[in-house]
């Protein structure tokens, strides 16, 4: 659909559709250790979803589409959470820097994002075009369900 952007569609459906697109394309380089790693110090267990790397990559691209100029440090703050310390008070803890770095590097190899000269990463024209195309597909699918 012309004129449909990422901001116009349901974000959960969009992230799922983009993750499916990244997995189906087979070009996203997934590290060998994805089934062993926790996503942050504040997590007790590794993710239960086996496709979590694709979902994280899709979520990261969506975030860069909406805000842009985010780097590894910004992504660790976004994916951080509450660190439980037993009987001591809970505090905020950042997400895994290695996971954020590997996701950004994998997306750079796909030419969806590039390094911003002002710091961080930003979407390329090809990445924006792909995201808008997938948003159009999600919008068309949701309109088909409503009718």
Curated annotation (Swiss-Prot):
Protein's UniProt keywords contain Calcium: no
Keywords associated with the record: Cytoplasm, Nucleus, Ribonucleoprotein, Ribosomal protein
Recorded GO MF terms: RNA binding; structural constituent of ribosome
Compartments it resides in: Cytoplasm; Nucleus
Broad class of the protein's primary localization: cytoplasm
GO cellular component: cytosolic small ribosomal subunit; nucleus
Entry keyword Signal: no
Quaternary structure and partners: Component of the small ribosomal subunit.
Protein name: Small ribosomal subunit protein eS19
Classification of source organism: Eukaryota, Metazoa, Chordata, Craniata, Vertebrata
């Amino acid at each position: 659909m012309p004129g449909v952007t990422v901001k116009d569609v349901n974000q959960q459906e969009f992230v799922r559709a983009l993750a499916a697109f990244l997995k189906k394309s087979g070009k996203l380089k997934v590290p060998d250790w994805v089934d062993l790693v926790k996503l942050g110090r504040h997590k007790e267990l590794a993710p239960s979803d086996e496709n979590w790397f694709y979902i994280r990559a899709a979520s990261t691209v969506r975030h860069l589409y909406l805000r842009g100029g985010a780097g590894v440090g910004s992504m660790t703050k976004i994916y951080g959470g509450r660190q439980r310390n037993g009987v001591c008070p809970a505090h905020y803890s950042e997400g895994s820097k290695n996971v954020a770095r590997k996701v950004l590097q994998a997306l750079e190899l796909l030419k969806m994002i590039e390094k911003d000269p002002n710091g961080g990463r930003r979407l390329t024209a090809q990445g924006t075009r792909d995201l808008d195309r997938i948003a159009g597909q999600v919008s068309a699918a949701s309109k088909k369900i409503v009718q």
